[in-house]
């Protein structure tokens, strides 16, 4: 039984069931990101090399996020690290980005969007401390 939120992504009529990250999966994801960045060269890179590294890191981060999410399914026996290579091979960049965004939203990893209406209401509200 899982208490995690879930949602479905429907690329080309297929259903991909994505889950909120558990506390354990979130820790695994953070550890993965830290280790990925430790191995990066820091000096003497050209702008093109920096762009390539940033692109590769983004895709790897997104793939791990999706893999960890998929590993949360009750019927999934593999860990996220085992699913990761499959995600890297089978997901095109656009689908990978969409899936990763959905996982971030399910997991509360995306800051809430403040609409213009909400900002106006907050500005117009009386300041109780000044009263």
List PLM regions with ranges.
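Short, surface-exposed, charged amphipathic helix/loop patches that serve as local interaction elements
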Residues: 2-4, 17-131
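Short acidic-hydrophobic surface loop/beta-edge motif
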Residues: 4-13
């Amino acid at each position: 039984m899982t208490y995690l939120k879930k949602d479905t992504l429907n690329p080309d009529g297929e259903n991909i069931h994505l889950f909120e990250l558990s506390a354990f999966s979130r820790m695994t994801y953070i550890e993965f990101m830290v280790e990925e960045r430790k191995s990066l060269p820091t000096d003497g890179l050209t702008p093109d090399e920096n762009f390539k590294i940033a692109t590769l890191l983004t895709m790897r981060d997104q793939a791990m996020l999706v893999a960890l999410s998929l590993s949360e399914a009750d019927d999934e026996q593999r860990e996220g690290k085992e699913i990761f290579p499959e995600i890297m091979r089978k997901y095109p960049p656009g689908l990978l980005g969409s899936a990763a965004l959905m996982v971030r939203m399910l997991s509360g990893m995306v800051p809430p969007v403040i609409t213009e209406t909400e900002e106006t209401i907050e500005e117009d509200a009386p300041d109780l401390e000044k009263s």
